[in-house]
Swiss-Prot record:
By combining the DNA-binding domain with the catalytic domain of the restriction endonuclease FokI, TALE-nuclease (TALEN, or BuDN) enzymes able to target specific dsDNA sequences can be created that enable eukaryotic genome modification. Other potential uses as transcriptional repressors, for transposon targeting, DNA methylation or histone tail modifictions are also possible. This is Burkholderia TALE-like protein 2. DNA binding experiments were performed with a construct missing repeat 11. Core repeat repeats lie at residues 84-116, 117-147, 148-180, 181-213, 214-244, 245-277, 278-310, 311-343, 344-376, 377-409, 410-442, 443-475, 476-508, 509-539, 540-572, 573-605, 606-638, 639-671, 672-704, 705-737, 738-770, 771-803, 804-836, 837-869, 870-902, 903-935, 936-967. Cryptic repeat + repeats lie at residues 968-997. The keyword Ion transport does not apply. Keywords: ANK repeat, DNA-binding, Plasmid, Repeat. Binds to DNA in a sequence-specific manner. Belongs to the transcription activator-like effector (TALE) family. Bat subfamily. The protein is composed of 27 tandem core repeats (the BuD domain) with 1 base-specifying residue (BSR, residue 13), which recognizes 1 base pair in the target DNA. It comes from the Bacteria. The gene is bat2. Cryptic repeat repeats lie at residues 51-83. ANK repeats lie at residues 772-801, 805-834, 838-867, 871-900.
Length: 997
């Protein structure tokens, strides 16, 4: 059984599994549990040859598990010969009816293989049991004739009751089509446990729900909670509406297993939760998961005790707001003191508890942490691996497999990255099974880590292994295949690319577009395929469609755009703003919420651009509703609309606003000003950053960090992790001679925590290559610096051979996107050299944020610009600033019109040769005529655009008349605006005038 045999390090001792009391109870409570324990005891040696301890426990946690374990021993060798990995076999066996499923896989897999189903498909279908496998064999061809793809059939079949769901689709699909449900909707409804009943219930209740304003998309989502959920919405929706819950909330709560019970619990418990200070958003979050009803009850029971231990309400909401939230809260209460004794912070405990299986993860950390520490894993690593669904299994797998990974050349950070996602345990096993074969195909270790380092990484790796040759034949290169696979649901996306790529290609979508849409998953590809003709008729171009589809929930976002676009147009939203709001994860919900709350926000003084900014991020729907709820209180506390928009207008904006409301008094007591609070809250993860500052600030102060230092480190994406990393790693940095300002510079960027870790790891190697400490800090002190440091080590020697010195390499690497810039220099340097650009030119172009894109733009547009009279110096000047690529494109696009309006080449170069040059040119094009009517000369406009930029031009346009009425001359206005920060200077002039009046 070569594919499933264990490595020597993985084998269990012959003394048995040494089950803990908790593990024994977990097995015994299942039907046939006693027989399972006896089987494990009697057959331990045989099982240990093919399964790890974690595998045995997984299979044993179901009814009749003894038969499933016996089936593994019987079928495992043959399945191994057919190419099934150990993880596949465990997955098939680890369900109710696992024994029959294994025997059926042996029976039907050859036929399914001939019909185009992959091994990944077979494993997934087997999750619906033996009957599902046989039903796919029987009615799969008919469903195929009706237009259902192989991926659709697998999705429907691979759940409890999959066989019945397939039969129901066959029977009910024509009627559902008549009612306006498309193929994607039908697959979504059927593709859950109890899918057959859900399809029937949709037919029964859809007319009534439709009359109440629920869309087809809404009904399909509610059906994810099963037939009962649909009936519950019908019964309870009027009362919930009276209590202030809007349709989006109701859909969210109902659309999960147990959705009916969750809706009832919200109705029963909402008033008590409100009395305790929980907001409507909190209640919705806790209720909107499997077991939501139990979670709400547990919060009511346990919240006082958790608050006494120092957990905040946001912490409690976060821990309760996942499947199994009730158990997680109880586990935190039981185990928190033991964690504190071992040095885990409150933030660590919350992170580990706040996932599916959080209770088991906490238990596993307590049990395995000493052994992991002995192997060199830090507390931060342990928290990262445990802090995902399936964290307990991931920790056990790391302990079992780490030595083998080390022998194969994987570093500790790579092991942590692969293990630190949903399904991390399976990912590690799959890498061990397939890594050698990938190496033979030329796939780099970094690519393997990238593919596996996402939710569902094991399946993605398996799919790449199987489909890569076919994708290569279609023209996809290794980089694009890795990119498609390296997202949650990567396996399904790869299969869908094969299905729909030929047609999308004919419709004008490029390979790059298809890869981007695949970032929204398989469903996004199929929905783009289905809706693109209609969206085109409405004026949306392929770029718009790609932007909307290429995110989580992209399929739903496309549907929502189709449904809501007319209503949004009536409200004054244009196509660009609709695309912006829809073009993020959760875009569909954002559009619905804009329609819902926009009038109320307008009454409160929020402009359309501000509403778009709040809505146009991940979680935009929640952010809009939270602004509506909290704005009056925040306003009373001195936060103005600009502050609120800034905080809310990021992914996680709703949570950030909630955190500001709760934590602001404590910050004020510690001397933080309002701008400090806004800066820390106004990033992705702002809520966590605020919490981390309150928790860690005293310790950081003791180490000599000032309040501005703390704000700078916390005020970026990942600020909470950066502060934690500074606290943990600062002594090591001090020992190596880094100053406090060095540490702050490295930590004070996106990904600061990873940058600190990378510096400690890579600094010795960089020193050997003659890079100084100042160089290392310079490279590390930017967004994306971890990759930049690694790229310097990887590409530095070749760049040196081509004549680039140390200072040049540091300049190129020491900007946002430095890693990509170094790679671009290697790739495009020879071509640029042939075209007359010297090394100094190349360094200037590449040595800015977005340097890689600038180099590509020079290659692409340089010849045309030269034909239009621009020389090499002009091109270097325009490309060699942040946003250089956009500047070159803008010159190419707008140059002829600007020439017609009297601007010469020197003017255009001057305006384009600054950060934001593209925007400056567009603004001159748009507003230049108006400014000319106000007696500003071409020279004035060029002066303002090339120094103050687009914002300064707009400020002059807006406030110029006011200033002129007050007696200020054009000459004075131009003098103030034509400087860096000119827009702010103009606004200050106006403010001073108003104060005097």
């Amino acid at each position: 059984m070569p594919a499933t045999s264990m490595h020597q390090e993985d084998k269990q001792s012959a003394n048995g599994l040494n089950l803990s009391p908790l593990e024994r109870i977990k097995i015994e409570k299942h039907y046939g549990g006693g027989a399972t324990l006896a089987f494990i005891s009697n057959q331990h040696d045989e099982l240990a040859q093919v399964l790890s301890r974690a595998d045995i426990l997984k299979i044993a946690s179901y009814d009749c598990a003894a038969q499933a374990l016996q089936a593994v021993l019987d079928c495992g060798p043959m399945l191994g010969k057919r190419g099934f990995s150990r993880a596949d076999i465990v997955r098939i066996a680890g369900n109710g009816g696992g024994a029959q499923a294994l025997y059926s896989v042996l029976d039907v897999e050859p036929t399914l293989g001939k019909r185009g189903f992959s091994q990944v498909d077979v494993v997934k279908i087997a999750g619906g049991g033996a009957q599902a496998l046989h039903t796919v064999l029987e009615i799969g061809p008919t469903l195929g004739e009706r237009g259902f793809s192989r991926g659709d059939i697998v999705t429907i079949a691979g759940n409890n009751g999959g066989a019945q769901a397939l039969q129901a689709v066959l029977e009910l699909e024509p009627t559902l089509r008549e009612r306006g449900f498309n193929q994607a909707d039908i697959v979504k409804i059927a593709g859950n446990g109890g899918g057959a009943q859900a399809l029937q219930a949709v037919l029964d209740v859809e007319p009534a729900l439709g009359k109440r304003g629920f869309s087809r998309v809404d009904i399909a989502k509610i059906a994810g909670g099963g037939a009962q959920a649909l009936q519950a919405v019908l019964g309870l929706e009027p009362t919930l509406r009276k209590r202030g819950f809007h349709p989006t909330d109701i859909i969210k709560i109902a659309g999960n297993n147990g959705g009916a019970q969750a809706l009832q619990a919200v109705l029963d418990l909402e008033l008590m939760l409100r009395e305790r200070g929980f907001s409507q958003a909190d209640i919705v979050k806790m209720a909107s998961n499997i077991g939501g009803a139990q979670a709400l009850q547990a919060v009511l029971n346990l919240e006082p005790a958790l608050c006494e231990r120092g957990f905040s309400q946001p912490d409690i909401v976060k821990m309760a707001g996942n499947s199994g939230g009730a158990q997680a809260l109880q586990a935190v209460l039981d185990l928190e003191l033991a964690f504190r004794e071992r040095g885990f912070s409150q933030a660590d405990i919350v992170k580990m508890a706040s996932n599916i299986g959080g209770a088991q993860a906490l238990q596993a950390v307590l049990e395995l942490e000493p052994a992991l520490h002995e192997r060199g894993f830090s507390q931060a690593n342990i928290v990262k691996m445990a802090g995902n669904s399936g964290g307990a299994q991931a920790l056990q797998a790391v302990l079992d497999l780490e030595l083998v990974f080390r022998e194969r050349g994987f570093s500790q950070p790579e092991i942590v990255e692969m293990a630190g996602n949903i399904g991390g345990a399976q990912a590690l096993h799959t890498v061990l099974d397939l890594e050698l074969a990938f190496r033979e195909r030329g796939v780099r270790q970094a690519d393997i880590v990238k593919i596996v380092g996402n939710n569902g990484g094991a399946q993605a790796l398996q799919a790449v292994f199987e489909l890569e040759p076919t994708l290569r034949e279609r023209g996809f290169n290794q980089a694009t295949i890795v990119k498609i696979a390296a997202n949650g649901g990567g396996a399904q996306a790869l299969y869908s690319v094969l299905d729909v790529e030929p047609t999308l290609d004919k419709r004008g979508f490029s390979r790059v577009d298809i890869v981007k849409i695949a970032g929204g998953g398989a469903q996004a590809l199929h929905t783009a395929f289905e809706l693109e003709p209609t969206l085109r008729k409405r004026g949306f171009n392929p770029t718009d469609i790609v932007k909307i589809a290429g995110n989580k929930g992209g399929a739903q976002a496309l549907q929502a755009v189709l449904e809501l676009e007319p209503a949004l147009r009536e409200r004054g939203f244009n196509q660009a703003t609709i695309v912006k709001m829809a073009g993020n994860a959760g875009g569909a919900q954002a559009l619905y919420s804009v329609l819902d709350v926009e009038p109320a926000l307008r009454e409160r003084g929020f402009s359309q651009p501000e509403i778009v900014k709040i809505a146009g991020n991940i979680g935009g729907a929640q952010a809009l509703h939270t602004v509506l709820e909290l704005e009056p209180t925040l306003h009373k506390r001195g936060f103005n609309p600009t502050d609120i928009v800034k905080i809310a207008g990021n992914s996680g904006g709703a949570q950030a606003l909630q955190a500001v409301l709760e934590l602001e008094p404590a910050f004020r007591e510690r001397g933080f000003g309002q701008p400090d609070i806004v800066k820390m809250a106004s990033n992705i993860g702002g809520a966590q950053a605020l919490q981390a500052v309150l928790e860690l600030e005293p310790a950081l102060r003791e180490r000599g960090f000032s309040q501005p230092d703390i704000v700078e480190m916390a005020g970026n994406i990942g600020g909470a992790q950066a502060l934690q990393a500074v606290l943990e790693l600062e002594p090591a940095f001090r020992e190596r001679g880094f100053s406090q300002s060095d540490i702050v510079k490295i930590a004070g960027n996106i990904g600061g925590a990873q940058a600190l870790q990378a510096v400690l790891e890579l600094e010795p190697t960089l020193r050997e290559s003659d890079f100084r400490q100042a160089d290392i800090v310079n490279i590390a002190g930017n967004d994306g610096s971890t990759q930049a440091l690694k790229a310097v080590i990887e590409h530095g020697p070749r760049l040196r051979q081509r004549g680039f010195n140390r200072a040049s390499i540091v300049k190129i690497a020491g900007n946002s996107g430095g890693a990509q810039a170094l790679q671009a220099v290697l790739k495009h340097g020879p071509t640029l050299d042939e075209r007359g650009f010297n090394l100094t030119n190349i360094v200037k172009i590449a040595g800015n944020g977005g340097g890689a894109q600038a180099l590509k733009a020079v290659i692409e547009h340089g010849p045309t610009l030269q034909q239009r009279g621009f020389n090499l110096t002009d091109i270097v000047e325009m490309a060699g600033k942040g946003g250089g690529a956009q500047a070159l494109k803008a010159v190419l696009e707008h140059g002829p019109t600007l020439r017609q309006r009297g601007f010469n080449l020197i003017d255009i170069v001057e305006m384009a040769s600054n950060t934001g040059g593209a925007q400056a040119l567009k603004t001159v094009l748009e507003h230049g005529p108006t400014l000319r009517q106000r007696d500003l000369s071409l020279i004035d406009i060029v002066e303002i655009a090339s120094n103050g930029g687009a914002q300064a031009l707009k400020a002059v346009l807006k406030y110029g008349p006011v200033l002129m009425q007050a007696g200020r001359s054009n000459e004075e206005i131009v003098h103030v605006a034509a400087r860096r920060g000119g827009a702010g200077r103009i606004r200050k002039m106006v403010a001073l005038l108003l104060e005097r009046q």
